[in-house]
């Protein structure tokens, strides 16, 4: 005998609006395109683009940066923070 039908949790989840699914920009690694071999901690303008408003480093899944450059980027940002070129938090202006 067959038991009662069971539903997956997928069926009970609310549906996402179609608007979010329509516009997806293809992410690309900025450093690969420009041919950068190594990220320098003294290039503050580039590093600022990868820091969120609250002071956190933006993850690679959002920026599209390749893993090798994301590691270099993290190291460069941390060095620039240590040398007071970049702020640690959002309490200070960049």
Curated annotation (Swiss-Prot):
<comment type="function">
    <text>Binds as a heterodimer with protein bS6 to the central domain of the 16S rRNA, where it helps stabilize the platform of the 30S subunit.</text>
</comment>
<keyword id="KW-0694">RNA-binding</keyword>
<protein>
    <recommendedName>
        <fullName>Small ribosomal subunit protein bS18</fullName>
    </recommendedName>
</protein>
<dbReference type="Pfam" id="PF01084">
    <property type="entry name" value="Ribosomal_S18"/>
</dbReference>
<dbReference type="GO" id="GO:0070181">
    <property type="term" value="F:small ribosomal subunit rRNA binding"/>
</dbReference>
<dbReference type="GO" id="GO:0006412">
    <property type="term" value="P:translation"/>
</dbReference>
<dbReference type="GO" id="GO:0003735">
    <property type="term" value="F:structural constituent of ribosome"/>
</dbReference>
<comment type="subunit">
    <text>Part of the 30S ribosomal subunit. Forms a tight heterodimer with protein bS6.</text>
</comment>
<dbReference type="InterPro" id="IPR001648">
    <property type="entry name" value="Ribosomal_bS18"/>
</dbReference>
<dbReference type="InterPro" id="IPR036870">
    <property type="entry name" value="Ribosomal_bS18_sf"/>
</dbReference>
<keyword id="KW-0687">Ribonucleoprotein</keyword>
<comment type="similarity">
    <text>Belongs to the bacterial ribosomal protein bS18 family.</text>
</comment>
<dbReference type="GO" id="GO:0022627">
    <property type="term" value="C:cytosolic small ribosomal subunit"/>
</dbReference>
<keyword id="KW-0699">rRNA-binding</keyword>
<keyword id="KW-0689">Ribosomal protein</keyword>
């Amino acid at each position: 005998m067959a038991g009662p039908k069971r539903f997956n949790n997928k069926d009970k989840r609310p549906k996402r609006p179609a608007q979010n699914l329509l516009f997806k920009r293809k992410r690309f690694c900025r450093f690969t395109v420009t041919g950068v071999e190594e990220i320098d901690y003294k290039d503050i303008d580039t590093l600022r683009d990868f820091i969120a408003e609250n002071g956190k480093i933006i993850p690679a899944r959002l920026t599209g940066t390749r893993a090798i450059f994301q590691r270099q980027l993290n190291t460069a940002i941390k060095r620039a923070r240590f040398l007071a070129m970049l702020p640690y938090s959002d309490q200070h202006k960049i």
